[in-house]
């Protein structure tokens, strides 16, 4: 019995000694912490990657076929295929140009702050293992590519039915490379308008493209419309309101990826962006319908989806 008691005392002393040594040297046992963090980061990267893959598909879905159907339903019947062709060709051309030069101009490591240079042209230095934050570089490239596709496609509504197909290709190419991509670099790519730029630590806050996408496309569309002048048949009603509604519905759903994906993470911020997007769209549609009811005596399908 005495021997057993002495063994228990020795074991207890060893445990206490081990605890004291652990407490004394825990600051030097840093190899334990990275192990835990690495597991958490791997899980987070997997969740973020899966969500942004879905968001990338949703944003592309906005152009093909969402925007095509929306604009196609608004024009005269004889120009529907022309609108489809414009949007489809823009998607193809912008994808190639973004791969070749656009991504590098927007997110390259340029030192001037005005453009990113050509260091990442043709995805130089980008492979399946390189990361951009918590995402694979190539996925971030693909997600931003869908933005570069839909932005010039938004301008189609300003010149549809009034310009040639070759002009669409030339204008969209030059506008994306010379206007859109540099502005992306200014705000999102660490350029002159980002944090630490000419505005100091404040920088320009553009969560999901209010400036980069919508304002740039809106100004370009306004300038083109002003140059072309009023339409001859501007009072002609849309030939297919059903197309307009289907296209607008696709845009509505696609915007969950557009806004929610701009969080670049699968977290509460993305969920909040999706919820706000949905409530805003619903409220805007009801508001527009109420305005049409007040002004014209009845609401219309095109007016409701336009809202």
Show the residue positions of the predicted features.
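Hydrophobic alpha-helical transmembrane bundles of multi-pass membrane proteins
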Residues: 39-306
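Short, Lys/Arg-enriched N-terminal segments with co-localized hydrophobic residues
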Residues: 8-12, 17-43
């Amino acid at each position: 019995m005495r021997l057993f008691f002495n063994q228990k005392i020795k074991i207890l002393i060893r445990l206490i000694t081990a605890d004291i040594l652990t407490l004394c040297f825990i600051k030097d046992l840093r190899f334990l912490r990275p192990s835990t963090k690495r597991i958490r980061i791997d899980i987070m990267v997997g969740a973020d990657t899966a969500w942004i893959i879905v968001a990338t598909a949703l944003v592309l879905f906005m152009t093909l076929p969402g925007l095509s159907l929306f604009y196609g339903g608004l024009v005269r019947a004889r120009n529907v295929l022309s609108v489809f062709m414009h949007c489809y060709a823009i998607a193809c051309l912008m994808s190639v140009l973004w791969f070749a030069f656009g991504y590098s101009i927007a997110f390259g490591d340029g030192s001037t702050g005005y453009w990113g240079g050509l260091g990442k042209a043709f995805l130089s230095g980008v492979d399946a293992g390189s990361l951009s934050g918590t995402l694979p570089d190539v996925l971030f490239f693909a997600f931003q590519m869908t933005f570069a596709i839909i932005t010039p496609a938004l301008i189609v509504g300003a010149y549809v039915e009034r310009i040639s197909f070759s002009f669409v290709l030339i204008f969209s190419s030059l506008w994306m490379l010379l206007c859109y991509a540099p502005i992306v670099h200014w705000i999102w790519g660490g350029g002159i308008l980002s944090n630490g730029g000419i505005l100091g630590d404040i920088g320009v806050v553009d969560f999901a493209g209010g400036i980069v996408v919508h304002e740039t496309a809106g100004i370009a569309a306004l300038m083109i419309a002003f140059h072309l002048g009023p339409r001859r048949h501007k009072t002609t009603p849309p030939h297919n309101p059903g197309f307009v509604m289907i296209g607008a519905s696709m845009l509505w759903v696609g915007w969950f990826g557009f806004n929610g994906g701009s969080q670049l993470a699968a977290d509460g911020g993305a969920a909040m962006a999706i919820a706000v997007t949905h409530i805003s769209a619903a409220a805007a549609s009801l508001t527009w319908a109420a305005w049409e009811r007040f002004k014209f005596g009845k609401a219309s399908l095109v007016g409701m989806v336009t809202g």
